[in-house]
Amino acid sequence: MSRIQQTFAALAEQGRKGLIPFITAGDPDPAKTVEFMHALAAGGADVIELGVPFSDPMADGPVIQRSSERALARGVTLKSVLADVKRFRETDPKTPVVLMGYANPIERMGVDAFAAEAHAAGVDGVLVVDYPPEEAGVFAEKMRAAQIDPIFLLAPTSTDERIADVGKIASGYVYYVSLKGVTGAGNLDVSSIAGKIPAIKSRVPVPVGVGFGIRDAETARAVAEVSDAVVIGSRLVQLLESAAPEGAAAALKTFIAELRAALDGAGKTAR
């Protein structure tokens, strides 16, 4: 059982919902990434999604695009992100880490080399935004062979056939994009999310995390009522964009702790 699977099994046993924060590796300061990861874990994150910056992040809105640009300008690469995970693992052997990004940096490194290096660094999962599930079978097999969970996106527009395709190859969890468009956009409609989750649950044998549009404890709690986990990214990237450097880690921890408390309340009402 992978670290991600163990985490979700423990959450289910406790009647709690997962909290999955996203930050871009290297933003705003590459030297702070590992400190930020520890702050997320200390605040109550169950899984950490670490964005691998890319020059053409087509699924991301302006906030995360700017974040990627800043990280790339500071020399952040896939190799340096893996080094950050390895440093994080030196003092946190428990919190799962998922790399989220695009195919190009992985393919430049080589899928086999990436799988080996990611496993050695302590990566638990990988979500490649631009790998459609119908073309990702071999990639998913190679990740699982390296004890890395391949994680896939589903959207409001996903057909039952697409959901079933994902169900055949996903492990760890699936990430349901609750809004059409790019990250950080729009307003949440929890009833529409609740309407889609049963179709996913009936075809996908792993937990469902919901993200895009979650901005505060209130929206996190509402989404947690109808999902297994809540993913929050753009709001955290904005927080880091505006925080004073010396207080950024503490601000992250405080914000995540507020979400954690809200989700634990949702978990209790769901039991």
From Swiss-Prot:
Give the keywords, sorted. Amino-acid biosynthesis, Aromatic amino acid biosynthesis, Lyase, Tryptophan biosynthesis
InterPro entries given for it? Aldolase_TIM, RibuloseP-bd_barrel, Trp_synthase_alpha_AS, Trp_synthase_suA
Give GO terms: molecular function aspect only: tryptophan synthase activity
Q: A Gene Ontology CC term for this entry?
A: cytosol
PROSITE patterns for this protein: TRP_SYNTHASE_ALPHA (PS00167)
Per its UniProt record, what SUPFAM superfamilies does this chain match?
A: Ribulose-phoshate binding barrel
Enumerate the active-site residues: 49 (proton acceptor), 60 (proton acceptor)
| Listed EC numbers | 4.2.1.20
Transmembrane is among the record's keywords: no
Which domain of life does the UniProt lineage start with? Answer: Bacteria
Output the CDD domains linked to this UniProt entry. Answer: Tryptophan_synthase_alpha (cd04724)
UniProt pathway annotation? Amino-acid biosynthesis; L-tryptophan biosynthesis; L-tryptophan from chorismate: step 5/5
Catalytic activity line of the entry: (1S,2R)-1-C-(indol-3-yl)glycerol 3-phosphate + L-serine = D-glyceraldehyde 3-phosphate + L-tryptophan + H2O
- Family affiliation: Belongs to the TrpA family.
Subunit annotation: Tetramer of two alpha and two beta chains.
Protein purpose: The alpha subunit is responsible for the aldol cleavage of indoleglycerol phosphate to indole and glyceraldehyde 3-phosphate.
Matching HAMAP family:
Trp_synth_alpha
Which protein, by its recorded name, is this?
Tryptophan synthase alpha chain
The organism of origin for this protein: Burkholderia cenocepacia (strain ATCC BAA-245 / DSM 16553 / LMG 16656 / NCTC 13227 / J2315 / CF5610)
- Taxonomic classification, please? Bacteria, Pseudomonadati, Pseudomonadota, Betaproteobacteria, Burkholderiales
What gene name is listed for this protein? trpA
